[in-house]
Amino acid sequence: MTAPAELWAVWERISRRRPLVHCITNPVTVNDCANALLAAGAHPFMAAHPDEVEEVQLRADALVINLGAIAQLDSIGKAARQAVACGHPIVVDPVGVSASSLRRRSCIALLKEFPVACVRGNGAEIRALLEDTGTAAGVDAPSEDAASAHEIAAQLARRHD
């Protein structure tokens, strides 16, 4: 568990640096994602068109991929390649991987191809990625208990380290 002092130090660094975060997300969550980044002290940039994502990523400090934007796989690949070339961290939100084999396969491919710094998902999503199975009904599927969630997250991290 991360100590509150460590979390506060990270928060202060973000607030001082004010990183530009390139987000490829779905239209349903775009406003929430932008506002969360603004509240954390970052600058969000929502860009998903395949002709602009590489240019945007050149100027960004990080890339956040939300698999709710599954129709943007071409853009996601281009942005991720540019992020790697620039040394930018990549965060993946595996929205719906427990309910969609397309999203699950796409996310597993991302994890194999790119050095993803963080997978931000609930227990059902992480388990679906670890076991390559889908059993949940949707993105709000019941999560694991804390101990189980920690263990499956650690297993997924070891697999894709």
What residue ranges belong to the model's regions?
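Small-residue (G/A/S/T)-rich helix-start motifs and N-terminal tracts that mark the onset
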Residues: 1-78, 82-84, 89, 151-161
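Surface-exposed, flexible loop/turn segments at secondary-structure boundaries
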Residues: 29, 71, 98-100, 127
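Glycine/small-residue-rich loop that forms an oxyanion/phosphate-binding "nest" at active or ligand-binding sites
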Residues: 66, 74-122
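Glycine-centered flexibility motif
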Residues: 68, 96, 137-140
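Conserved phosphate/ATP/ADP-binding segment of small-molecule kinases
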Residues: 101-161
